[in-house]
Amino acid sequence: MYKAKKTTDSSLESLIKRATDETLTTNNWEYIIAVCDKVKSDPEVATKKAITILTTRLQSKDANVLLRTLSLIIALGENCGSRMQQEIASEAFLKPLTKKLKEKKLHETVKVEIAKLIEQLHQSFKSDPSLKPMSDAYNKIKQEHPRYLERNVPAKPEKHDVSSKTQSEEDELQRVINLSLQEYEREQFSKSLQKPLPDPKKTSPRNANIAQEDSDDKKPEISKVRAMFDLVSHEKDELSFRKGDLINVIEVVYRDWWRGSLPTGEVGIFPLNYVAPVYAKSSDQIEKELQIENRLLNVESKKIDKVLAMLSAATNGNENIDDEELENLYGQVSGLRSQLGHLIMKHTQREKELKLLNEQLAIEDKAFHDLLDKSISSFSNRNSYISSDVVPYPTGGNGSVNSGYPAVPNAYSGYNTYNGNGTPLAMQPTSLGFGNSIYASQPQQQPPRQVSQQMPPQDYQSYSNINSFPEVDRM
């Protein structure tokens, strides 16, 4: 969408003008929320002031201003409390609004949106008797202008499980195309209001079959769909969206329901008869778009600069202006508005998608590192608990470790030498025989000299090699 001029003025009038700027081709919810917050910060004063400004904006002849103002009125009516609801539901505010439905010069799109505003606020206000003028306005539109309320919105299909029988991708694609075409044919009265649709020659079932016969291996994959109708759902797992929204397809959930995500990050299931497939562009189409973009930036932009320079010179009183040249140049550059608008919308949408992707990536990255830190902390605590239960390594009499060998017991040497029956440990049965004296005949590794100086008497070594080793001179 086009971006409105950024302003640092935080006054209510500036915020409303920014949210309803004529350069906005779609609703900017950041601007709308800013207006709602401003009104809620001082409802006693800001409510009446906002209504006065909105009434002035509704007198504009620009369709973009009117459409953005209608969306702002809905947001204020549903989010800014009872004072705002009383003002919006007053006859003084509703009467000029409903009169616009009779204006012949007003675009059909604006009239449909006015009727939708009255209908939506009627549903929101009908439980409050003090807001009855809104219900009266809705009933009046139903009687006098029913065509603006008769939108052929399809019923949501039942949620049937996907059949166990395998279906080819082409059959699934064909069924989606048929559903989309049927819904477009039903929406006769608002065809002119729809966004540009794919060429029917390319998407009709007959031509789809021909394409299948010509090239079976070229099967387009549906990764995105575009909403054809508004869907406001209160079901927990269903996705709510507006007409024209792009939905990224995630997976097939039911036969006629898929799961998808909006550019805002919302995820849910949606019915197939509310959307139309969006196909990936071919390499030729991408190349053609790049050529058009390069031509606009490198060639046509110079013409625009030249027209601006000539107009500036004419404004300053320069009479040496070639009117014919200026007229020709203006005719050439004025036709570029639609192409420039398309490029702005394309790159703005891409910017939104990339920003959202970056935010989601940051959230997932933080969640991953939090999980990793928690795992490391848990592992460290477990190791600390285990190490606290390990028996300390035996030490000598002076408290130092005896180079990997057990030290000679001092006061409690008999405790390690005899068992409870008075039998020496060296004489106890083992898997290799009786006692440990078998090791006495095998050469032992030479211990450090300080260990040999602490050896017990020789007669004690004859039956126990647990706590003593032979001296080097005797081996």
Swiss-Prot record:
Cellular component GO terms, alphabetical = endosome membrane; ESCRT-0 complex; vacuolar membrane
Describe the location of the VHS domain by residue ranges. Answer: 19-149
**What's an example of a GO molecular-function annotation for this chain?**
protein heterodimerization activity
Q: What biological-process GO terms show up in the record?
A: ATP export; microautophagy; positive regulation of protein maturation; protein secretion; protein targeting to vacuole; protein transport to vacuole involved in ubiquitin-dependent protein catabolic process via the multivesicular body sorting pathway
Which InterPro entries does its entry note? ENTH_VHS, SH3-like_dom_sf, SH3_domain, STAM, UIM_dom, VHS_dom
> What range(s) does the UIM domain occupy?
168-187
- Keyword annotations: Endosome, Membrane, Protein transport, SH3 domain, Transport
What SMART domains does the record tag this protein with?
SH3, VHS
Q: Does the keyword Phosphoprotein apply?
A: no
Q: How does it sit in the membrane?
A: Peripheral membrane protein
* UniProt protein name: Class E vacuolar protein-sorting machinery protein HSE1
The organism is Scheffersomyces stipitis (strain ATCC 58785 / CBS 6054 / NBRC 10063 / NRRL Y-11545)
| Taxonomic lineage | Eukaryota, Fungi, Dikarya, Ascomycota, Saccharomycotina
**Gene label:** HSE1
